[in-house]
Structure formats: structure tokens, C-alpha cells
């Protein structure tokens, strides 16, 4: 009996606090749907397709509106002009990342993806400096990608034209490219530890994109209950063990005057700052940063290419045009290089359209304001959660006629030349844009052109029967599972 009385009092206090918060905070925030106590607007938002719900709410409340995922307000930015103003023109004010209970447990506020403040600034600046010194964005990294693509093509030939799921092989290329930069070596595709490492990334992405993970973010108390988030934490622990094993190998052979890879550079930086108690360069930060680099450079790229292959199976006429351009510009025997992209406008347009159409990250993990912000006539307090709906730019019907249709013409002018678009925000925008954007662009071009140079893609069903609907259209657009045949040409 006492337990029920306690729960009743507890719930009453929650409702009172919620209503008080509504009166004192919400009146200055942008408009939005009226939230329910405790639940907020979560019952009004389809967690399986948040971007669709955002579109409907934006039509009613405008491009800047407030919704409650649980008991805390979240300001939603919808539409290219609003996104540009907040993320680019006023990027500093919207540059912090909001932490969920699950991600806070994993990142500990470290690394380059989920950190904020001085840790983020120093770690990101250092990481970019090291990556550039090791050839990121230059011919050096292009050579590494080309070398890894050779292993991919060999693995695809070994399928002998039989049906196969390309997921693992497509993930091997970006993962090994990152590995060569961080660990200074690649892994054989048959390496069981490497296979498990990639599998853990794939599982983590699926869990993060799940409705359960979104509910855990809204209601942290769920974090203490049984659920798939425990699988997420287990996978993270396994990955950290894998990374630590590589770090220890580097520590044993470290040459302070001759760094060979990212780990060496970081360990040397740690050594230089070992007497600085406030140094951001710690072993924990190194482990989390490496995990961030692998996460940013592996799953997004491989899933985009996989989704791209599915679309090329669905639209064989597009595939044929790419292969014609490959034959004309590159030929059958020379391996593709990044200089070729300037002479292949149709292929470039297809790659951009794949990313625009699939909208892999419709709504990135929320940011938060770094200070009190006056934005378009509204007051947004410091620390307020902010959602940037990238779908609203990528699927803007004024910039991209028939945005729900896959059409490479969205990125071609009337003369067939490649046409850039400021609305292309597949990698987000501003200070928190994807750190691996340049690498991802190179990998997508070199992998796709190499595959189509050497293979014909054969679907297992009629192209018109292929379903390209994502299986989890929530925070991530995960492609449906499928198989295809790679027929050597």
C-alpha cells in the first residue's frame, strides 16, 4: 500500500514539475504541439519515421518549432534556409552535441563525435592535423583506397556469380582504409576478429536507429531495464578491447621521433603532455577517438554503397549509363582514379542522387545550444536540445522536383554537366559536419566505378519488383536486406 502511495506522490510531483516547466519555459520557445505530462509529444511522433512526422508538424507550426520527446523540450529546425542560418551562419551557437544516457556511457564525453567544449575542439583539431599529414584528401589516401579495392574485386570474383549479400565485403574497404591510417596495417577479410569488429559496428548502428534507443533517450530510466541497449554496450566493450590491443602493440614499439600512424602521433602527444593534469590527450580519449573514426568512416560509407547497388539493380538504365561513361573515360583495364570524376558528370550525379534519395541520416543526433540564443524571434535557452531535419533540405521539392523519385537529373544541368546544390546536406553542415566527408566521397566513387568496371549487376528478381524502402526509417535509413550476383565482364 505504501508503495502505491509513494508512486502516486512521485507521479504527481512529476506532473507538477512538468506543468511548471511548461508555464515558465515554453512560453518563450518556438510554437509546437501541446505536450502531455511525462509523455510529451512522443505519442504524436511516429518513432519509426520521425522525419515524416517532422514534415507534418512543420507544415502546421512553421520551420522552427518545439516538441517534447519526454519531459524536455527539443527545438526542431526544418527547411534549408533555417538549417543554413543555424548550422552554418551561426554554427558556434548550435555546435554542442546533446548526450543520451546510452551514448554518454559509451563516449564519456570524449572523442570527436559526442564530445563538447575544449575536449572536442582540441581532439578534432589534432585528429584533422594528423589525418592530413598522413595523406587524407591527397593522393596518398587515394592509393590506399585503390589498393583495398583490388582485394574487394578479388573477393567478389570468388563468389563466381552466385547470389551473395554484399554487406560485409563493402564494409571491409572503408574499415581497412581507416585501419591503415590508424593501425598502419590492413586485415584479411577472413580474420575472425576483424569480422567481429565490423559486425559490432553494424549491430550498433541498427540499435541506435531503433525505436527503443530513441525511447531510452527520452526516458533515461529505461536504460536500467533489460533491452537491446545492453547488447549495444556489450559490443562497445568488445570493440574497445580490440582497439586497446592495437594500442598496446604500438606502445611496445613506439619510436618518439618517427610516428607511423594515428596511434603513434597520439601516444607521442600524450607523452609530451604527461605532466599536464588538465590534458585532453589521455588513453581513454584515444580509445574513444579511434572508435569514432572507425564509426564515421565505415558504416555510413558501406551502407550508402550497398543502398546504391540496390538502386542500380532497380534502375538498370542508370547502371548502363554509368558503365558507358566508365568505358569512355577510364576504359576496361586502367583502374579508376579521382581525376576521372571531373570527366564523369553522370556518375558524379548518380552518387549524389543516391545519397540524397536514401537520406541515410534524416535527423542527426541532436545538438544543443552553447549559449542563450535569439533565433528568428524566439528565445532558445543555453543547453536546449536542437534537432536538424536534414530531410527537409535533401527532399526539398523546389530544389529537387519530385524529391521522392530517384533521378540523377537532380544534379545535372541542361547540358549534362554536373550541377552542385547547396541543399545537398548528406554529411550535415557547419562545425559538426562529418569529419570523414572527403574520404567518404573518394571511397564511394572509387568503389562504385571499380565494381561496375569489372562486373555486371544481376538481380534475383525483376527490377520492377525490387523494394527500396528502408527497413528502419527512423534516425537512420537502413537498406533492406538483399542479394545479387556479380557477373564478371
Curated annotation (Swiss-Prot):
Record's GO cellular component terms: cytoplasm; endoplasmic reticulum membrane; intracellular membrane-bounded organelle
Annotated compartments: Endoplasmic reticulum membrane; Microsome membrane
Keywords: Endoplasmic reticulum, Heme, Iron, Membrane, Metal-binding, Microsome, Monooxygenase, Oxidoreductase, Signal
Chief location category: endoplasmic reticulum
Secretion signal span: 1-27
InterPro entries linked: Cyt_P450, Cyt_P450_CS, Cyt_P450_E_grp-I, Cyt_P450_E_grp-I_CYP2D-like, Cyt_P450_sf, Cytochrome_P450_fam2
Name of one Pfam family that matches: p450
Recorded superkingdom: Eukaryota
Record-listed E.C. numbers: 1.14.14.-
Catalytic activity entry: chenodeoxycholate + reduced [NADPH--hemoprotein reductase] + O2 = alpha-muricholate + oxidized [NADPH--hemoprotein reductase] + H2O + H(+); ursodeoxycholate + reduced [NADPH--hemoprotein reductase] + O2 = beta-muricholate + oxidized [NADPH--hemoprotein reductase] + H2O + H(+)
Top-level EC class: oxidoreductase
Cofactor: heme
MF (Gene Ontology): heme binding; iron ion binding; monooxygenase activity; oxidoreductase activity, acting on paired donors, with incorporation or reduction of molecular oxygen, reduced flavin or flavoprotein as one donor, and incorporation of one atom of oxygen
UniProt-listed GO biological process terms: organic acid metabolic process; xenobiotic metabolic process
Binding site for heme: 434
Membrane topology designation: Peripheral membrane protein
Function recorded in the entry: A cytochrome P450 monooxygenase involved in muricholic acid (MCA) synthesis. Hydroxylates at the 6-beta position two major bile acids, chenodeoxycholic acid (CDCA) and ursodeoxycholic acid (UDCA) to form alpha-MCA and beta-MCA, respectively. May regulate NR1H4/farnesoid X receptor signaling, as taurine-conjugated MCAs are antagonists of NR1H4. Mechanistically, uses molecular oxygen inserting one oxygen atom into a substrate, and reducing the second into a water molecule, with two electrons provided by NADPH via cytochrome P450 reductase (CPR; NADPH-ferrihemoprotein reductase).
PANTHER family linked to this entry: CYTOCHROME P450 2C70, CYTOCHROME P450 508A4-RELATED
Annotated family: Belongs to the cytochrome P450 family.
Protein name as annotated: Cytochrome P450 2C70
Amino acid at each position: 500500500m505504501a508503495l502505491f502511495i509513494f508512486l502516486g506522490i512521485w507521479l504527481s510531483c512529476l506532473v507538477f514539475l512538468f506543468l511548471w516547466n511548461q508555464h515558465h519555459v515554453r512560453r518563450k520557445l518556438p510554437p509546437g504541439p501541446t505536450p502531455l505530462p511525462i509523455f510529451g509529444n512522443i505519442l504524436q511522433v511516429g518513432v519509426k519515421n520521425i522525419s515524416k512526422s517532422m514534415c507534418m508538424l512543420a507544415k502546421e507550426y512553421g520551420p522552427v518549432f518545439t516538441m517534447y520527446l519526454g519531459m524536455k523540450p527539443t527545438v526542431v529546425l526544418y527547411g534549408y534556409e533555417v538549417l543554413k542560418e543555424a548550422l552554418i551562419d551561426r554554427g558556434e551557437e548550435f555546435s554542442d552535441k546533446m548526450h543520451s544516457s546510452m551514448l554518454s556511457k559509451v563516449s564519456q564525453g570524449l572523442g570527436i563525435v559526442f564530445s563538447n567544449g575544449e575536449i572536442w575542439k582540441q581532439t578534432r583539431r589534432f585528429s584533422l592535423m594528423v589525418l592530413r599529414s598522413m595523406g587524407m584528401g591527397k593522393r596518398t589516401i587515394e592509393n590506399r583506397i585503390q589498393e583495398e579495392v583490388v582485394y574487394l574485386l578479388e573477393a567478389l570474383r570468388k563468389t563466381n556469380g552466385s547470389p551473395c549479400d554484399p554487406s560485409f565485403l563493402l564494409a571491409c574497404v572503408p574499415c581497412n582504409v581507416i585501419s591503415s591510417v590508424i593501425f598502419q596495417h590492413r586485415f584479411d577479410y577472413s580474420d575472425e576478429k576483424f569480422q567481429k569488429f565490423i559486425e559490432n559496428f553494424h549491430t550498433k548502428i541498427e540499435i541506435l536507429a531503433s525505436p527503443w534507443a530513441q525511447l531510452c533517450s527520452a526516458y533515461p530510466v529505461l536504460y536500467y531495464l533489460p533491452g537491446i541497449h545492453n547488447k549495444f554496450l556489450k559490443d562497445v566493450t568488445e570493440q574497445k578491447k580490440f582497439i586497446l590491443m592495437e594500442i598496446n602493440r604500438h606502445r611496445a614499439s613506439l619510436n618518439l621521433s618517427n610516428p607511423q600512424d594515428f596511434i603513434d602521433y597520439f601516444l607521442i602527444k600524450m607523452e609530451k603532455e604527461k605532466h599536464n593534469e588538465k590534458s585532453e590527450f589521455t588513453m581513454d580519449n584515444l580509445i574513444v577517438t579511434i572508435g569514432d573514426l572507425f564509426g564515421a568512416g565505415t558504416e555510413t560509407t558501406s551502407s550508402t554503397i550497398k543502398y546504391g547497388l540496390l538502386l542500380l539493380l532497380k534502375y538498370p538504365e542508370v547502371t548502363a549509363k554509368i558503365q558507358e561513361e566508365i568505358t569512355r573515360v577510364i576504359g576496361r583495364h586502367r583502374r579508376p582514379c579521382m581525376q576521372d570524376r571531373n570527366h564523369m558528370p553522370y556518375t558524379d550525379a548518380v552518387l549524389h542522387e543516391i545519397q540524397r534519395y536514401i537520406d541515410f541520416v534524416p535527423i542527426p543526433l541532436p545538438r544543443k545550444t552553447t549559449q542563450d540564443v535569439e533565433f528568428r524571434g524566439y528565445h532558445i535557452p543555453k543547453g536546449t536540445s536542437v534537432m536538424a531535419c536534414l530531410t527537409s533540405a535533401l527532399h526539398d521539392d523546389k530544389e529537387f522536383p519530385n524529391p521522392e523519385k530517384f533521378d540523377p537529373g537532380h544534379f545535372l544541368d541542361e547540358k549534362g554537366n554536373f550541377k552542385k546544390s547547396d541543399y545537398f546536406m548528406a554529411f550535415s553542415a557547419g562545425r559538426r559536419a562529418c569529419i570523414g566527408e572527403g574520404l567518404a566521397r573518394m571511397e564511394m566513387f572509387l568503389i562504385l566505378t571499380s565494381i561496375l568496371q569489372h562486373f555486371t549487376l544481376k538481380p534475383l528478381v525483376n527490377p520492377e519488383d525490387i523494394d527500396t524502402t528502408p527497413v528502419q526509417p527512423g534516425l537512420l535509413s537502413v537498406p533492406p536486406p538483399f542479394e545479387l550476383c556479380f557477373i564478371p565482364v
